[in-house]
Amino acid sequence: YQSGYAPRTIIDGAIRDRNFADNTVWMTFAVNTIIRELGDPSLLYETVKFNDTEEEYPVYEHIKRSVDFLYNFQGLYGLVRIWGGDWNDCVNYAGLKGKGVSVWLSIAWCRANRQFAEIARWLGKEDDARTADERGKIMEERIEAYGWDEKGGYYLYARTDDDIIMGGSDCDEGKIFLISQLWSVLAGLPRGAEAMEHAEEILETPIGIRLAYPAFSYQRDYIGSMAEKAPGVQDNGGIYLHPSAWKLAVDSILRRPDRVEEGLRKMLPFDTTYGVKCGEPYAMFNSYFAPETGYRAGTPGQSWRTASSSWMLKSVIEYVFGLHAELAGLRIDPCLPLSWTECSIVKVFRDCTYEIFYHGDGTGSDVLALSVNGKTVPADTPIAPVSGETLKIDVTLGKKA
């Protein structure tokens, strides 16, 4: 929309509007990814309509307005309002009065805003980039002041209309939520690694990492349908696989190959290394029921209709195998499990086929050497595509001294 707000769903060509606050934040991520894959920022000049106008505007203006909208969509303490839910659309009562805020969405906005600043600089729009930088600093200060739990050592999830904290160490239930900790790393916040350590201590189970803990045991009118589900089921403390996939990216960023392997094994339905899951061994699920569900533990919450598969694909290719698309080419910075001493992947990138072979010694996942068609190249340099050609790339992995 012209305001910068985006709808949640379009089905059969019809817009299905809902009062979820996070819809808009994903636009910048999508555009940034497409431009990096294509290597061509000219997409930003293409014009398209808003949903509520016949006049066309450049794609750049669309994402600028989306970032502006969320920054100005402020509730308590200047954080981003949660409205009728964020990514967790089952927290649908927390912000109906217009005051409740999502610490997670405020953190996610920081990542989107940083990407927008980069996009602005691609087009030489330095004033927009500087404004984004300044706003980013302001929002990060608010998050650290009003979204950090000093006692717990991690980030809160939300503050409701009546300023009831969700995801704080003094809460009786729902003391910690996973997604705030994950995105604090993705957004580059200063205490992200510390938050993740505390999150894993509390949330990890033999079949995956919980979305929240302890699960809510009774309905609460300031939360919503999350607290109406049985403890350990889906949003209410279940093993939700969207965040599990995000965690693969986070563990890769933090250079933790052992936890990457553990996370992959726990997500895959056929792997019983740490615990048994039930369901089709060839499908991805949205969640597993957590251990407190008793004999139902490991049962899928939903299969065949979930974004877990696409999130896992993105995390594995971009972060675990480390294939980072940049304007100049493909930068390789993996965090492979140490047991994967020999593996390979093929990626077609801008009409060029990259055949990439990884050779590890089991000591680490740092890139020690990189060669293209037998010629050594700097390990931290993007490899430019050659249209119509096949590049054979060898990556030597180990532990840097």
Language-model-derived ranges and their functions:
Residues 108-223, 265, 269-297, 348, ...:
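Catalytic cores of carbohydrate-active enzymes
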Residues 17-20, 35, 60-61, 145-147, ...:
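A general structural signal for short secondary-structure junctions and capping/turn motifs
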Residues 38, 116, 120-123, 127, ...:
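Long alpha-helical scaffolds in large eukaryotic adaptor/regulatory proteins
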Residues 1-7, 36-38, 50-79, 135-153, ...:
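Long, well-ordered core segments of solenoidal/helical folds
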